[in-house]
Amino acid sequence: MAPLATSTVTSTTITQGPAPPTHHAHPAFPAHATLSPTHWEVWVFDAVSQDPASNAALEISFFRDATGLFRGRAPLRIAFHAQLPGGGDDGAGPPEAVHFDEVADESVVEDRGDAIVSTWRSARDPARTTTFEYAADLSGAVLTFDLPEVRGTVTYTNAGGGSSAVDGFAAFAPKIAYAQPMVAAGVEAALTFADGRALRFAGKGGGDRCAMQAPMPLLLDENTYVRGHAGPYTFALLRSVSRLDRGRECVRASLARDGEVVFVAAASDVSLADDHVVVRAAHGGNVRGTFADTSSGWRLDFVSPAKGKHWHFDVQHQVVWWSIPLGPPPAKLGNNGFTSRVSGGEVGGEKHEGMAVVGHLQMPQMPATKK
């Protein structure tokens, strides 16, 4: 049966000007119909083992993004970050990271009715592919890798089950739309790398979506992404400081208990009436990023005055997972990833422990386009 809708883009076909919208309601389907030097979008999947001694983790981002063409950045790419536990012959060493960018020549996304299926064909060999498939009701997702660097699957099972009523994108910040298709999921990872190493773990994770109408350096001063787990709780948080809106803090947070979303907020101002989330940097820990930011974690408060509920979680960085400079010296601006310890729960109730995936970046100013 033919797909209900198809979005195909190639790395050499770029719209000169704003990308037209697809007008598709499902958050896993592309928001933009074409590649454009001004519009871009990303699908993000993460997972982390809940064994604090392991630090096994994944973060995979699928980019349709031509905003970096002027500086030689491939418009179709998959950013792959893996962290393998226990390096060394005895397995007791520090975790080992695997990072690479897979460049694609073509990205095809199909709405097949019961699933949104995306295939990314390698620029090196079109027979080599990476795919992701979301169930239409968001009950699960599967990532499949058939690349020289890595082969295998990562399977997500939505802890909240599926739903016939699927929320789409919502405005997050000026020129930025955001969605959290899968807040809390169980994850099974089974990957084998070219050198024979393997990453196999059962953990927790989820999936996010973001679509922007300008290059990120024009929109944001900094950006923080956290998906944390502690006992029955999972929280997904995106926090950005807007460059267009004079430093306004923009935030979107969801909190789930046993898979059921019990709290959603898009406000960071403390209120006696409205749901809000308070995000504060933590300092004094043993692990912090490699750039200007000196925080060693985050302190998160999810507050619902109307329900009389307050949840608090401490996120303490455990391992610096990746470190990507985003500007030349002397400015110490860049993108850090962490696996982090989580502790917390409902204030006055039982305290739970777990692990999180954290990304934090500070953006340089947009460089001038070469003439």
Locations of regions flagged by a protein language model:
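Structured soluble/peripheral alpha/beta segments that form catalytic or ligand/cofactor-binding pockets
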Residues: 1-371
